[in-house]
A protein has these predicted regions:
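N-terminal secretory signal peptides that target proteins for export/translocation
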Residues: 1-11
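Sec-dependent signal peptide recognition
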Residues: 10-21
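Intrinsic-disorder-associated interaction segments
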Residues: 13, 86-89, 108
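C-terminal motif of bacterial Sec signal peptides marking the signal peptidase cleavage site
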Residues: 25-26
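Non-cytosolic coordination micro-motifs
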Residues: 31-69, 100-190
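Compositionally biased P/S/T/G-rich terminal and signal peptide-adjacent segments
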Residues: 68-92
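Acidic/histidine-rich, surface-exposed loop or edge segments in extracytoplasmic proteins
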Residues: 92-102
């Protein structure tokens, strides 16, 4: 009789455990999902602090160079163009930028939300902010996330801009930045 109670008790415990884990999994709180989050060290196969071999210089400032890499190690299908900000002296990467200017407004907003969702699942952010202004020109919807070690990302959709080089007036941008990138919080308002 005593052993039957133990078996029934174990079965009930197992059922409750199964239900509990199923609920946690459906809410996105399962312990394995939390363990899979990684630190932000780069994007598209580029790593912060690394030197880039092949690139075309787009602009130069006192401390920075903006370059377009000739080879993308891990391209993303949403991104049409890539740019890197390099320290002018060391030629090391401080920012990684991906751009797409062929989306319609609704597509841009949807792609931005998908990117934000994916980024939040992948990385731990200590600080996040969102900015949405769809009333005034240029319209914008921006997400900012920064980790405890000050690496971060800005994902934005800017609309009604009026590009000279494109038929679209919409820009999807994703900017990954290292702590060495100055004024990272100002990226929200650029």
């Amino acid at each position: 009789m005593f052993f039957k109670k133990i078996k029934i008790s174990k079965s009930i415990d197992q059922i409750f455990y199964f239900i509990f884990m199923t609920l946690l999994g459906s809410c996105g709180l399962h312990h394995q999902n939390l363990e899979k989050k990684t630190e932000l060290i780069g994007a598209f196969g580029f790593h912060f602090g690394a030197k880039v071999q092949g690139y075309e210089i787009k602009s130069e400032e006192d401390e920075l160079m903006i370059v377009e890499p000739t080879v993308i190690p891990r391209p993303n299908s949403l991104i049409e163009r890539y740019a890197l900000k390099l320290d002018r002296k060391t030629k090391r990467i401080s920012e990684i930028i991906g751009l797409n200017h062929s989306f319609q407004q609704r597509q841009c907003l949807q792609a931005k939300e998908e990117l934000v969702s994916s980024i939040k699942e992948r990385y731990n952010f200590e600080k996040t902010e969102s900015l949405e202004d769809l009333e005034f020109r240029p319209k914008k919807s921006v997400f900012y996330g920064e980790s405890a070690n000050k690496f971060g990302v800005v994902i934005g959709c800017l609309m009604n801009i009026g590009f000279v080089y494109s038929n679209s007036d919409t820009l999807l941008i994703i900017r990954y930045f290292a702590p060495s990138a100055k004024n990272s919080m100002q990226l929200l308002f650029q």
